[in-house]
């Protein structure tokens, strides 16, 4: 079961995954180094958990707890409960969707999976997060098996790419 922790100090080290989410360069190094990505909003958080991405922690305002309580019941994870003002101080932006989760990255496809796929979208060096998200959304919408991105492409698990791919 989740452990709920009230936090009122923006410098609390337990909030490190959520600091300065607007700084793309900082996020790239932090997320790659720690193997994490940030899911924003209840819909995205649920979808990530359902897809098998394990959460590291959650950051949310009190009014969002009940809407995610069923998800928390099955997880052994820390839920940092903060005011909306504190969430904005920590993240660097107004958290419109009220809930954030630090999620563990995983390798989703093996070479054998790629070889077995009938239809793949292959993208080389698409560097805009919104474009990557739109490509993923379109590929899913027309029933393609997956999207293969070149190493220099924008991160498909960056917040903006995720929001675009889900239409949120």
Spell out what each predicted region is:
Residues 55, 76-78, 144:
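A generic structural signal for alpha->beta connector loops
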Residues 101:
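Glycine-rich phosphate-binding loops that contact phosphosugars or nucleotide phosphates
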Residues 67-75, 111-113:
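Short loop/helix-cap segments at secondary-structure boundaries that form the rim of catalytic
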Residues 1-67, 153-154:
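Boundary-proximal intrinsically disordered activation/regulatory segments immediately upstream
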Residues 53, 94-96, 116-118:
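Short connector loops at helix/strand junctions that flank enzyme active sites
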Residues 2, 50, 104-108, 112-168:
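RNA substrate-binding interface of SAM-dependent RNA methyltransferases
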Residues 73-92:
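A glycine-rich helix N-cap at a beta->alpha junction
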């Amino acid at each position: 079961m989740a452990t709920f922790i009230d936090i009122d100090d923006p410098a609390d080290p337990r909030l490190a995954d959520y600091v300065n989410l607007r700084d793309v360069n900082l996020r790239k190094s932090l997320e790659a180094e720690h193997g994490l990505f940030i899911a924003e909003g209840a819909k995205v958080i649920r979808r990530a958990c359902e897809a098998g991405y394990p959460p590291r922690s959650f950051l949310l305002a009190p009014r969002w707890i009940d809407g995610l309580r069923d998800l928390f019941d099955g997880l052994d994870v820390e839920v940092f409960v903060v005011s909306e003002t504190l969430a904005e101080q920590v993240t660097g932006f107004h958290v419109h969707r009220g809930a954030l989760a630090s999620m563990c990255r995983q390798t989703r496809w093996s070479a054998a999976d790629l070889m077995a796929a009938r239809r793949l979208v292959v993208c080389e060096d698409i560097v805009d997060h919104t474009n990557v998200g739109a490509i993923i959304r379109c590929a899913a919408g027309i029933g393609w098996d997956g999207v293969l991105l070149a190493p220099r492409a924008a991160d498909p698990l960056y917040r903006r790419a995720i929001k675009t791919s889900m239409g949120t």
